[in-house]
């Protein structure tokens, strides 16, 4: 019964569905509207606002199988993954939830009945923990459920503070909290370990399988516990743990999902030892990596993307350890989809993107993996002690892309630890250097704190009255301004848009009779809008009324560029894949810049298709609509939110026909046709996994096209062709140039041969050895190597030294026939000469080259060759 993990998942959800619960799909691994979380790490994450009373749902009972990741940040299991029976970067949490509906009695009954009746687990194998003072739960467990008192364990405050207990759950320092009951399974006395609360509780015999949290208090800032008006329930059961029990195994890595992935990895890498811990690491990591990419995370050097990169690189390193000679990690995705069943729906839709992203990251790391491992191996072999210094760990990170935990993973296998504090010091020093190198003059407004509130009226008007509520000069609040003063003016109401969401701030004028304040920029300061600029005439004081006039032309051009970023975002997702997410943008009156996640460069044909699709949507002349609604409504409409952003309860949703719908607080055109034309001017990578498109619109796009046409016409004139035949004419010209270059090379070879015949006759005898030392004129540096080969052949046995002096540059070459290399090394001789002309060089015993920066010293340097050789050939 329920022998597969997929069957167990279905049984759990069906059980709670029949008991009146709404089955809710797993939310994304990237928490939406909760920047406090790096990744979704519990089933209750998506219901957090419901528990806090900030979100209302149409149901009061829910159940889910939530995909979770614990790697990076506070919840980081990465170091232990693969080495223990139950640590994972990715896991599924089965859960049932009550939002002010049922409480302890039903929650306990639901859990017990599912385990003992549906799954038919032996009751004698189960024991339960409760919070020490939770007598209500004790009575339910003993009197109603029938758990023997000896199988019920009270756990008190065991973490050094009141309510700090394994059996008391709290969301934070304040807010909803309450006692919990945990159900444990006894794997048998053949496994070491003791019951919860005993000194042996850390053993593997008694394993927690279900945690039932009773949220019944609201913790105040002073520590007081106030009863919640509507107590709720949050439960969680790790599917991997219960699957291990149902499948009669002890380690999670022995269940069907992991065994399929382990066997597939072993097949790909031709490994026979299925107990190898590296196989466990890889089987775990493919789950987190594949599902993170499916949910829009791409490998990068910051935030979630860097955690993903660390996991991928750890898996690749373990593959290398097993003998992988080629990319292998991405090949596990089809097996993962197969074993995950219904839980892999999102993965199926993004399979191609996931595989390409994994392969690209693996190939990128492969370029430095071997060399980095060699450096690390050398450092460990030379190590005196059992701690690797942080500087070496940082070098591996900075030069070879080794995350510090990957270095620690390698060291661990040799019982060596990494000085992570030293690593952090080296990292901090690098950041300081980067900041110092990149410092520009800082505007005092960067740190300006303003408490005032400004009403923004600029969605519907560009001219409006406003009253001055505050004035700031050089970061300090002042009451008045005189002509010539530079300041920030805050109004109670303004049509000026303050820079945010990538859209630059408006420019324009604040004026009254005899008064004019030139606004050069507009910024947001909390809930206030600050107009930055200078008073060009008159005087101003707090309380004065002004007319605010936005520069209409600049605002309109900015709106063209902002609106087209929405079309561009939608086009990229449609043509490249739904993994594409916005990573940043800059929109002003001149151009737009759009950064997005993508694992490879955008091909020219893809870029053209994106541009064409955007222009098609412009020509369709969609009407733009902007509506304010609550977040749930926006989600239901399919509005795209920027992951990691914190949105208010009410959000503004901008829709462009049936093509684009996004959350956005910026200003836009009335219809897409207003944009006129969209032209991409460049595309490139700005970081691993992040691409950037720069583009222009409207009149700027027309000017860009006209400029390209003018350049094409100039090229046509130079080629004596019309515009239509420029490409064919240019190709013919390049073919001819290639042919001429080949002929020129052949002529140079003939000239070198002729020159060598003449030069060979100039050789002199030094202690019975033929020696030719010559400064050459009219010979290219590229011909030196061939010329010295020719001369050595002509001499039969001898030494050749040639030099060329150019503009502030010297080129040298020394050739020694093999019969003489025991007496004279070409590298030593060329180094001696180079040191006299401001250079250095080296090479093989029979041929070496060098460069220098002092051509004026070449003659004297060459004069020293014969004495140098005379001494060595004596």
Swiss-Prot record:
Reactions catalysed: tRNA(Ala) + L-alanine + ATP = L-alanyl-tRNA(Ala) + AMP + diphosphate
InterPro entries attached to this UniProt entry: aa-tRNA-synth_II/BPL/LPL (IPR045864), Ala-tRNA-lgiase_IIc (IPR002318), Ala-tRNA-ligase_IIc_anticod-bd (IPR018162), Ala-tRNA-synth_IIc_core (IPR018165), Ala-tRNA-synth_IIc_N (IPR018164), Ala-tRNA_ligase (IPR050058), Ala_tRNA_ligase_euk/bac (IPR023033), DHHA1_dom (IPR003156)
Binding-site list for Zn(2+): 562, 566, 664, 668
Cofactor binding note of this UniProt entry: Binds 1 zinc ion per subunit.
Cofactors: Zn(2+)
GO cellular component term, pick one: cytosol
GO function terms (MF aspect): alanine-tRNA ligase activity; aminoacyl-tRNA deacylase activity; ATP binding; tRNA binding; zinc ion binding
EC class of the enzyme, as a word: ligase
GO biological process, one term: negative regulation of DNA-templated transcription
Sorted UniProt keywords: Aminoacyl-tRNA synthetase, ATP-binding, Cytoplasm, Ligase, Metal-binding, Nucleotide-binding, Protein biosynthesis, RNA-binding, tRNA-binding, Zinc
EC number: 6.1.1.7
CDD domains xref list: AlaRS_core
Localisation per UniProt entry: Cytoplasm
Pfam families: DHHA1, tRNA-synt_2c, tRNA_SAD
Family: Belongs to the class-II aminoacyl-tRNA synthetase family.
PANTHER family listed in its UniProt record: ALANINE--TRNA LIGASE, CYTOPLASMIC, ALANYL-TRNA SYNTHETASE
Protein's job: Catalyzes the attachment of alanine to tRNA(Ala) in a two-step reaction: alanine is first activated by ATP to form Ala-AMP and then transferred to the acceptor end of tRNA(Ala). Also edits incorrectly charged Ser-tRNA(Ala) and Gly-tRNA(Ala) via its editing domain.
Domains as described in the record: Consists of three domains; the N-terminal catalytic domain, the editing domain and the C-terminal C-Ala domain. The editing domain removes incorrectly charged amino acids, while the C-Ala domain, along with tRNA(Ala), serves as a bridge to cooperatively bring together the editing and aminoacylation centers thus stimulating deacylation of misacylated tRNAs.
Protein name: Alanine--tRNA ligase
Gene source species: Shewanella sediminis (strain HAW-EB3)
Lineage summary: Bacteria, Pseudomonadati, Pseudomonadota, Gammaproteobacteria, Alteromonadales
């Amino acid at each position: 019964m329920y022998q597969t993990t997929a069957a167990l998942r279905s049984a759990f959800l069906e059980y709670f569905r029949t008991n009146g619960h709404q089955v809710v799909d797993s939310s994304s691994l990237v928490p939406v509207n909760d920047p406090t979380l790096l990744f979704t790490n519990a089933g209750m994450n998506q219901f957090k606002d419901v528990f806090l009373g900030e979100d209302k749902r149409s149901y009061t009972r829910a159940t889910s199988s939530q995909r979770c990741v614990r790697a990076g940040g506070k919840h980081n299991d990465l170091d232990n993954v693969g080495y223990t029976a139950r640590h994972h970067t990715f896991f599924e949490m089965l859960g049932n939830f009550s939002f002010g509906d049922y409480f302890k009695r039903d929650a306990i009954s639901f859990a017990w009945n599912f385990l003992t009746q549906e799954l038919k687990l032996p009751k004698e194998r189960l024991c339960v923990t409760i919070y020490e003072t939770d007598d209500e739960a004790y009575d339910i467990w003993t009197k109603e459920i029938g758990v023997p008192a000896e199988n019920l364990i009270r756990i008190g405050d065991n973490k050094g503070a009141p309510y700090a207990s394994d059996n008391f759950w709290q969301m934070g320092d304040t807010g909803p909290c309450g006692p919990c009951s945990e159900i444990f399974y006894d794997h048998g006395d053949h496994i070491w370990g003791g019951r919860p609360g005993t000194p042996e509780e850390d053993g593997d015999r008694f394993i927690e399988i279900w945690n039932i949290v009773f949220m019944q208090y609201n913790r105040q800032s002073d520590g007081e516990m106030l009863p919640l008006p509507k107590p709720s329930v949050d439960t969680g059961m790790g599917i991997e743990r219960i699957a291990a029990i149902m499948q009669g195994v002890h380690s999670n890595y022995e269940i069907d999902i992991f065994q399929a992935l382990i066997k597939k990895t072993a097949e790909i890498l031709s490994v026979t030892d299925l107990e190898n811990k590296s196989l466990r690491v890889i089987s775990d990591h493919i789950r987190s990596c594949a599902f993170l990419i499916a949910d829009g995370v791409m490998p990068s050097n910051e935030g979630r993307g860097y955690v993903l990169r660390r996991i991928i690189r750890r898996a690749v390193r373990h593959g290398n350890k097993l003998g992988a000679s080629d990319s292998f990690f991405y090949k596990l995705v089809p097996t993962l989809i197969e074993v995950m069943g219904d839980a892999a729906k999102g993965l199926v839709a993004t399979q191609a993107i996931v595989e390409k992203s994994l392969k690209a990251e693996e190939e990128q790391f492969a370029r430095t993996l071997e060399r980095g491992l060699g450096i690390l191996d050398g450092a460990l072999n030379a190590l005196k002690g059992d701690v690797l210094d942080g500087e070496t760990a940082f070098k591996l990170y900075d030069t070879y892309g080794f995350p510090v935990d990957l270095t620690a993973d390698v060291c661990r296998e040799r019982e060596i630890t990494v000085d992570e504090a030293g690593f952090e010091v080296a990292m901090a020093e690098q950041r300081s250097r980067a900041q110092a190198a990149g410092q520009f003059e800082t505007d005092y407004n960067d740190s300006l704190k303003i408490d005032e509130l400004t009403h923004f009226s600029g969605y519907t008007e560009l001219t409006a009255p406003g009253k001055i509520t505050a004035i700031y000069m050089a970061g300090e609040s002042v009451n008045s301004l005189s002509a010539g003063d530079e300041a920030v003016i805050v109004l109670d109401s303004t049509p000026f848009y303050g820079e945010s969401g990538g859209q630059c701030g408006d420019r324009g004028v604040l004026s009254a009779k005899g008064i004019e304040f030139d606004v050069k920029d507009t910024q947001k300061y909390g809930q206030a809008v600050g107009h930055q600029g200078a008073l060009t005439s008159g005087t101003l004081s707090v309380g004065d009324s002004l007319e605010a006039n936005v520069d209409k032309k600049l605002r309109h051009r900015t709106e063209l560029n902002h609106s087209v970023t929405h079309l561009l975002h939608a086009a990229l997702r449609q043509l490249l894949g739904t993994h594409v997410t916005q990573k940043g943008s800059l929109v002003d009156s001149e151009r737009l810049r759009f950064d997005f996640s993508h694992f490879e460069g955008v091909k020219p044909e893809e870029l053209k298709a994106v541009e064409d699709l955007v222009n098609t949507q412009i020509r369709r002349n969609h009407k733009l609509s902007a509506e304010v609604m609550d977040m749930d409504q926006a989600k239901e409409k399919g509005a795209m939110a920027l992951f990691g952003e914190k949105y208010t309860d009410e959000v503004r949703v901008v829709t462009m026909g049936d093509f684009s719908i996004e959350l956005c607080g910026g200003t836009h055109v009335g219809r897409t046709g207003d944009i006129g034309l969209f032209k991409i001017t460049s595309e490139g990578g700005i970081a691993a996994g992040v691409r950037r498109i720069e583009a222009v619109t409207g009149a700027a796009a027309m000017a860009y096209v006209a400029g390209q046409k003018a350049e094409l016409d100039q090229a046509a004139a130079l080629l004596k062709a019309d515009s239509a035949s420029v490409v064919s004419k240019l190709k013919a010209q390049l073919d001819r140039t290639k042919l001429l270059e080949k002929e020129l090379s052949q002529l140079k070879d003939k000239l070198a041969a002729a020159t060598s015949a003449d030069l060979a006759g100039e050789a002199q005898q030094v202690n019975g050895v033929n020696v030719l030392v010559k400064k050459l004129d009219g010979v290219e540096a590229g011909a030196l190597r061939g010329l010295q080969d020719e001369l050595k052949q002509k001499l039969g046995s001898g030494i050749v030294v040639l030099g060329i002096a150019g503009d502030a540059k010297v080129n040298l070459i020394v050739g020694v026939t093999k019969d003489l290399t025991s007496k004279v090394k070409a590298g030593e001789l060329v180094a001696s000469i180079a040191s006299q002309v401001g250079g250095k060089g080296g090479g093989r015993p029979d041929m070496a080259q060098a460069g220098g920066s002092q051509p004026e010293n070449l003659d004297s340097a060459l004069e020293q060759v014969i004495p140098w050789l005379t001494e060595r050939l004596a």
